[in-house]
Amino acid sequence: MFRRLLIATVVGILAVFAVAGFRHAMLLLEWLFLNNDSGSLVNAATNLSSWRRLLTPALGGLAAGLLLMGWQKFTQQRPHAPTDYMEALQTDGQFDYAASLVKSLASLLVVTSGSAIGREGAMILLAALAASCFAQRFTPRQEWKLWIACGAAAGMAAAYRAPLAGSLFIAEVLFGTMMLASLGPVIISAIVAWLVSNLINHSDALLYNVQLSVTVQARDYALIISTGVLAGLCGPLLLTLMNACHRGFVSLKLAPPWQLALGGLIVGLLSLFTPAVWGNGYSTVQSFLTAPPLLMIIAGIFLCKLCAVLASSGSGAPGGVFTPTLFIGLAIGMLYGRSLGLWFPDGEEITLLLGLTGMATLLAATTHAPIMSTLMICEMTGEYQLLPGLLIACVIASVISRTLHRDSIYRQHTAQHS
């Protein structure tokens, strides 16, 4: 047992350096090609001329597609083992390391060029790769899946500053692929990754800054639960739209570089209306939480961002869909809150409350992981007073969504991009 805890600690540290390496590479490319040192792709897009804002995501997609196609032609074969940590956990616990690194590099290209895809997916993959590489050298074969799970949880903890949610992500999303008794090392890896990440960044700040002054009462619980019902209906719709967009891109029968370039071009066109469509949505989420916009502004940005996410994901851009889903949930919750706020004197607080609820419940509806989704929002914002209400709403959203759509967003995304 002591040996496992020691290895879990090492895996957590390796995951932090994997995540930090990707993050610093991303910041370097943004500085080199976009002249942006703010860390915000939305700021970068705002400061670019219209033609560069239009073409940059397309060129990034083209470069990523050429890289992926070139690697496949160079090796003259498809990956001989999984290039995704979920696939690795569901098979024999092995990766095609070279193909996985190329996939991560392609993700780096599309992320830094503005595609509306999550950077955290590549971070978690690299963390799992580091854990797998260590495990194959120093642990018996039957433990390889456990250490990949630890690496993924640690990567998620470092990327989102949410160690408990990172642990439960493994337990809920991949339920059945590992025994509950193995959760101890997973939690250790996640917490170690969170602590080391805080030390490296010289900060233990929350991922999102929120000023929610409301005290949750009976009326608020009713609104939170109703938001869960709404998210439970919206989740399957989002998954259906993502699947339809993917099929649409595939039906065009374009070579990977042109398919990814087309997805990037759509993002570029949308960014001419609002630069908020660039990136994974983190900056826009923070701005909405700081000062919730008016109804029509939320609706306009939401529609543009949704189309950008569908174009990026549908075209096969390598990256995560977790953070973009958080923004979509926030926007749905805030639109609902703004509509209800017309009849309540504290409309601003209701909008913010239901925005946070929307983040948690749409995440639950798309991942089918209600406990992880609840803890994720609480850990990222520090609003633990919402935990009871969010937990109920997330369970409701997950049940409704699972009834209407069998596959979670991760299983659907893995099936599309494998």
From Swiss-Prot:
Any Gene Ontology CC annotation = chloride channel complex
Subcellular location per UniProt equals: Cell inner membrane
Q: Which UniProt keywords are given for this protein, alphabetically ordered? A: Cell inner membrane, Cell membrane, Chloride, Chloride channel, Ion channel, Ion transport, Membrane, Transmembrane, Transmembrane helix, Transport, Voltage-gated channel
Fetch the Pfam families from UniProt: Voltage_CLC
Q: Does the keyword Transport apply?
A: yes
- Those parts of the protein on the Cytoplasmic side are 1-4, 75-145, 194-221, 279-290, 337-351, 401-418
Please name the InterPro entries in this protein's record. Answer: Cl-channel_core, Cl-channel_volt-gated_ClcB, ClC, ClC-type_chloride_channel
Q: In terms of domain of life, where is this protein from?
A: Bacteria
This protein's membrane topology, according to the annotation, is: Multi-pass membrane protein
Which SUPFAM superfamilies does the record match to this protein?
Answer: Clc chloride channel
Give one GO molecular function term: voltage-gated chloride channel activity
Work out whether the entry's keyword set contains Phosphoprotein: no
Mind telling me which Gene3D superfamilies this protein's record contains?
Clc chloride channel
Q: Any transmembrane segments, and where?
A: 5-25, 54-74, 146-166, 173-193, 222-242, 258-278, 291-311, 316-336, 352-372, 380-400
Function according to Swiss-Prot or TrEMBL: Probably acts as an electrical shunt for an outwardly-directed proton pump that is linked to amino acid decarboxylation, as part of the extreme acid resistance (XAR) response.
User: Which PANTHER family does the annotation name?
Assistant: CHLORIDE CHANNEL PROTEIN CLC-E
Protein family = Belongs to the chloride channel (TC 2.A.49) family. ClcB subfamily.
Q: What is this protein called?
A: Voltage-gated ClC-type chloride channel ClcB
Source organism (scientific name): Shigella flexneri
